Amino acid sequence: MKVTKSEIVISAVKPEQYPEGGLPEIALAGRSNVGKSSFINTMINRKNLARTSSKPGKTQTLNFYIINDVLHFVDVPGYGFAKVSKTEREAWGRMIETYLTSREELKAVVQIVDLRHAPSQDDVMMYDFLKHYEIPVIVIATKADKIPKGKWEKHAKVVKETLNIEKEDRLILFSSETKKGKQEAWSAIEQMIAR
């Protein structure tokens, strides 16, 4: 998809704040600081529409971005960050669960993991949650530029095995620095929207 227009629509915390209009939605989920904002900015050719932060746990709302007036990206709060209170974590958990399990416009979740490391227990729980609710998922392993090309396959195998990725689910190696995987990610997203 050639992105010519993108903007943030709303930062929502409850269903009545979600945008109306019935556009398909792709949610982006991942551990805090895994590079979700960089992924969004790379996909839409913008430097900082999605704010990148060195402070993990910065996104505390569901941020809806409209792309070319045909689709929403929904940035979900990062999971697995310890420096917020248990109450806050539980509130985020409920907000995310409500959105993921009840939003009709949701077509798929892009789950972002760090290619350099084996997925965390939180990553595994998120993937299992999506499979349990039969929510289509695309796994994006980001920061591919940070490891030598010769080791990509080995790292990808660790991601696949740790998450126990099912055959029908795509694993795409991605880098916001080099734009590797950008076209492949768009084509996977477009397939999900067309379903």
From Swiss-Prot:
Domain of life: Bacteria
Positions of Mg(2+) binding: S37, T59
Positions of GTP binding: 30-37, 57-61, 75-78, 142-145, 174-176
GO cellular component: cytosol
Cofactor: Mg(2+)
UniProt entry keywords in alphabetical sequence: Cell cycle, Cell division, GTP-binding, Magnesium, Metal-binding, Nucleotide-binding, Septation
GO molecular function terms attached to this record: GTP binding; metal ion binding
Gene3D superfamilies reported for this sequence: P-loop containing nucleotide triphosphate hydrolases
GO aspect biological process, one term: division septum assembly
Domain called EngB-type G: residue spans: 22-195
A Pfam family the protein falls into: MMR_HSR1
NCBIfam families in alphabetical order: GTPase_YsxC
Function recorded in the entry: Necessary for normal cell division and for the maintenance of normal septation.
PANTHER family tied to this protein: ENGB-TYPE G DOMAIN-CONTAINING PROTEIN (PTHR11649:SF13), MSS1/TRME-RELATED GTP-BINDING PROTEIN (PTHR11649)
UniProt record similarity statement: Belongs to the TRAFAC class TrmE-Era-EngA-EngB-Septin-like GTPase superfamily. EngB GTPase family.
Name the record gives this protein: Probable GTP-binding protein EngB
Native source species: Bacillus licheniformis (strain ATCC 14580 / DSM 13 / JCM 2505 / CCUG 7422 / NBRC 12200 / NCIMB 9375 / NCTC 10341 / NRRL NRS-1264 / Gibson 46)
Source species taxonomy: Bacteria, Bacillati, Bacillota, Bacilli, Bacillales
